Amino acid sequence: MAERVLTRVHSLRERLDATLAAHRNEILLFLSRIESHGKGILKPHQLLAEFESIHKEDKDKLNDHAFEEVLKSTQEAIVLPPWVALAIRLRPGVWEYVRVNVNALIVEELTVPEFLQFKEELVNGTSNDNFVLELDFEPFTASFPKPTLTKSIGNGVEFLNRHLSAKMFHDKESMTPLLEFLRVHHYKGKTMMLNDRIQNLYTLQKVLRKAEEYLTTLSPETSYSAFEHKFQEIGLERGWGDTAERVLEMICMLLDLLEAPDSCTLEKFLGRIPMVFNVVILSPHGYFAQENVLGYPDTGGQVVYILDQVPALEREMLKRIKEQGLDIKPRILIVTRLLPDAVGTTCGQRLEKVFGTEHSHILRVPFRTEKGIVRKWISRFEVWPYMETFIEDVGKEITAELQAKPDLIIGNYSEGNLAASLLAHKLGVTQCTIAHALEKTKYPDSDIYLNKFDEKYHFSAQFTADLIAMNHTDFIITSTFQEIAGSKDTVGQYESHMAFTMPGLYRVVHGIDVFDPKFNIVSPGADVNLYFPYSEKEKRLTTFHPEIEDLLFSDVENEEHLCVLKDRNKPIIFTMARLDRVKNLTGLVEWYAKNPRLRELVNLVVVGGDRRKESKDLEEQAEMKKMYELIKTHNLNGQFRWISSQMNRVRNGELYRYIADTRGAFVQPAFYEAFGLTVVEAMSCGLPTFATNQGGPAEIIVHGKSGFQIDPYHGEQAADLLADFFEKCKVDPSHWEAISEGGLKRIQEKYTWQIYSDRLLTLAAVYGFWKHVSKLDRLEIRRYLEMFYALKFRKLAQLVPLAVE
């Protein structure tokens, strides 16, 4: 048999050197074209366009070499003649950096700090400052276990359970943290799980075997109260279960773990320990209320997400507490900002019960300054100078309201996650982070060209807050894989925070690791009481039909609806979102306006913005102006209807179904969408859905089966795809039904709040245990974050102007 020969894997630089040596003229020609763009940043589509434009013979010579591979993996090229630096993404979360001298055709490898320093020259010119603040979290997590496979990203809890069970199997003493963890459980002074009769592992195993033997003699339905006193005498307290059967299951699981730990048993056991009774959910910005707020500035999907999340979470908590054999009423507090100028909403009310719950409330706390309470709405980009006093006040309010510390704090969006970090740090409780959207990815190059953005958006403070929160938190929930690590061709939201620079402030050489096991994908659903299939006739809310028909087809043009639909027999393509640049509603209108085939086939209805009042939001003002211009320029009246934002969620659910009755479709055209709750809502109603391929909807929709993915940067193609669909449906109506049914099936399999709630509480348990066993290891990073907060964030927050009352 031939002897196996090990060959060295050549570095990226070596492979590029080899290609340069073999094809100097062809590569020089290409790089010269890149250099001719002059100083600046070139994105992937620009680089590939230049490559496609070179002569076919020259291109063919490069096709089989490392150069094409590098080019397709390059996320940006920094051009500073004669140098071109490339940021090369080999796979999600794995990057390399090189630069090429176009004149000398020399390739140099760059470290992350060297690449960022080179990039800064776009703004600062050549600088000799060797003392730029560099932020590096890698040393604090180097000893933590992490997966290395791309498929493991977003499955952190599974990896963590495997690691913990392997560690526990190492020797008997490794079980001691589990014993200590079980002994610390109590609620308002009442001991749970184990009492002080059990001091060591030997006693624990002995007691568990005795309990197992006794429980096998009882009927499975025997109530815990029947043997509670007997268990107390041997060291076992309430929390194991409400019946003999459930208690026996728990005791057998623990005995199995003590004998031979495995990851599945560990997760199941930790998930059934009574740990979460009081939950605080932070969402300070916008108009947070249950009615008449959707469509207000900064008030959209996040509010819907939380108001759907909380009833499902409470139901799961009540179910678990009952099954644990406890008589405890859980509490959930949604903490938001109190707005004295509530403009016809309940945002000025301190405490408001959440609909459909027994023990959940919205708790509102005002922003205040030395001059008193701030009365008016403030943009989410301008909340930073108020956060510190707000967090102090929130700490006092939740302690008074709960009469206990929360067991879990969940942050939402940048300022909610910063608040959650500071509160969790102060109270020593488990923290969960939900970003919803990280603005850095929504505004390309807002880091390097910070000066162009900071006066309007104050990204210096926001990006700093994001870094603090994502590194402080115990676990992070995302709705999709793309939110963490993008796709084969696109960079993820969190991934974009791995390395970046804000010239004049600091460089981030290691901001986050997408392989960190704190990341978990837990997708939300839609409220099944509001969003159900159009075909369920007995549940349909036909009472709303006259209002909906008036909304869509009335000949009246006013502040609520502009333009009329002349042909009521056409299907309707429909969209509903906030009217801002990223949501791209005006983009959809432009695609429709410029496609005669689509205009002939269908009507277009857009719900977004509020023409009933003057907007204070600058982006909304700009988008409104653009919408008026499109209507006039393309003579859309007769085929198009622009409806002001609709705040009645119950009626909106029926609106989706009414559009389905017209054999229409829903379109979500955003330039980027972290998840896409409206996509889930539309699909839940059986409405065929076309949604952006930039972000979460690309994971929700299986193209051609449960809907269609569209590229918001290629509007002509998107419009043609829509036209093709409706032409096919005209010939074959079953095609519409097939896509509708495919969407419903997809939602039922993956996107429900029941699945979400079960997963969230299990995560809280596992990471609560992880926090307990690794508390000493986490201390260092938290001290580092304290310093970063005090020395950097506070100063940046103070630079944000206070609102003028």
Curated annotation (Swiss-Prot):
InterPro entries: Glyco_trans_1, Sucrose_synth_GT-B1, Sucrose_synthase_pln/cyn, SUS_EPBD, SUS_N. One of its GO terms (biological process) is sucrose metabolic process. Its EC number is 2.4.1.13. It is an enzyme of class 2 (transferase). Keywords: Glycosyltransferase, Transferase. Residues 275-752 are annotated as: GT-B glycosyltransferase. Pfam families: Glycos_transf_1, GT-B_Sucrose_synth, SUS_EPBD, SUS_N. It catalyses: an NDP-alpha-D-glucose + D-fructose = a ribonucleoside 5'-diphosphate + sucrose + H(+). GO terms for molecular function: sucrose synthase activity. Sucrose-cleaving enzyme that provides UDP-glucose and fructose for various metabolic pathways. Belongs to the glycosyltransferase 1 family. Plant sucrose synthase subfamily. This is Sucrose synthase. It comes from Solanum tuberosum. The lineage of its organism: Eukaryota, Viridiplantae, Streptophyta, Embryophyta, Tracheophyta.
